[in-house]
């Protein structure tokens, strides 16, 4: 990664609108929409656009438009268990002043999903959830979609002290969240199955 001393600050406008409601004691719904227009938007760029393995730097995109929406729902099964899910759609377009106008940024998967089940009782918290995406451009991704599972477990020892264990990508899926393919493999792959154990103290 190489720095860029000529980097300019982003300027622009962002609009958001949303609505959250609780239908009853068990169901919560939410929907949000957003739109932004930025000048000198900051993004990563390969020094050699034809070689994703070349050095990268942060650079200003002339103009960027981003629009999208998110829908989420939570359903309380019992006092201890609940399920939740969300869907996010995002579209990013950029104009690099190359005479071609705005073009879609295909490094971003347009459809993103999350669904999980949570357990909360006394000092215990646990969550198992799946994360996925679809609609990715196969010129930038090995596969247009992916799905992976994560697990977290937490125990509150005291008011300000807790211990936790987390497992990521339980399915050991091969996937990426940022576009880039070289010789049929992801240039920026996400980690395979991994585990984390830790503690947290608040003061």
Question: Residue spans of the language-model regions?
Answer:
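Membrane-embedded beta-barrel scaffold of Gram-negative outer-membrane proteins
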Residues: 6-61, 65-67, 178
């Amino acid at each position: 990664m190489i720095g860029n001393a000529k980097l300019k600050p982003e300027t622009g406008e962002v609009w958001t609108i949303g609505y959250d409601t609780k239908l009853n004691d068990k169901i919560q719904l939410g929907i949000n929409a957003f739109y932004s227009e930025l000048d000198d938007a900051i993004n990563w760029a390969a020094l050699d656009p034809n070689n994703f393995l070349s050095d990268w730097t942060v650079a200003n995109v002339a103009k960027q438009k981003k629009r999208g929406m998110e829908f989420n729902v939570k359903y309380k099964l019992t006092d201890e268990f609940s399920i939740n899910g969300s869907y996010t759609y995002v579209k990013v377009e950029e104009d690099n002043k190359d005479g071609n106008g705005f073009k879609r940024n295909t490094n971003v998967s347009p459809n993103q999903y999350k669904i999980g089940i949570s357990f909360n009782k006394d000092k215990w918290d646990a969550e198992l959830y799946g994360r996925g995406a679809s609609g990715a451009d196969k010129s930038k991704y090995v596969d247009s979609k992916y799905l992976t599972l994560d697990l977290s477990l937490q125990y509150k020892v005291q008011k300000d002290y807790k211990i936790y264990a987390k497992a990521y990508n339980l399915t050991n899926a091969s996937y990426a969240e940022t576009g880039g393919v070289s010789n049929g493999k992801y240039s920026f792959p996400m980690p395979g199955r991994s585990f984390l154990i830790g503690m947290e103290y608040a003061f």
